[in-house]
Amino acid sequence: MEQHIVESLNLDDYLFRSYSEGERVVTLYIGYYYTADKVGAAHSPLVCFPGQGWEISTPKAASVTTAGSRVSAEQIMIRKGQQRELILYWFQAYDRTSPGTLKQKLNNFWAKLRSKPEDNAFVRVSVTIQGNHVEDAAKSAETFIQAFYPAFFDYVTNQQSS
C-alpha cells in the first residue's frame, strides 16, 4: 500500500494480498495494531468505500465456523459501475472477533483483564461477484476464511505482549 495510506491508518503492520484458485480471486487485507491504544484506528468499510465512490449494501451479520473457532463478521456487497464485490470483515481482539469497533473495544478490555496481549486487527476478505453468482462469492469467502483463520488465530494468540 502507499505510505500515506499506511500512515493514515496508523498501522503497525499489514498484509494486503490476493489468492486465486481457477478463476476465483480472494483478496485478504489485515491491518494490524500492537497496542490497545490503536483499537478503533481501523475504520469500517462502511466509511471508506463510499468515500471512494462505491455503493454499499445494508450490512448483515455473518458467522463462519472454522476449526475450533467461530468468526463473527459483517457482510456487505459493494458496487462501482459494473464491478461488484462481496466483503466479509471483522475486528480481532486477541482470541475474539466482532463485526464492530465497540465490541472490539470490549473484547480488548476482556483480553487485558486476562493478561493477554493487546494486539488487535481489522480483517477484510473480498471476492469479486461474477455475473449474478452472489452465493458462489459468499461460499468462496467462507471457504477461504475456514482455511485461513486457524493460522491467523494461532498467530494472534501466540504473540508475546508488545
Residue ranges and their predicted role:
Residues 1-8:
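Solvent-exposed beta-strand/loop surfaces of large extracellular or lumenal domains
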Residues 10-160:
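A cross-kingdom signal targeting lumenal/periplasmic-facing segments of multi-pass membrane
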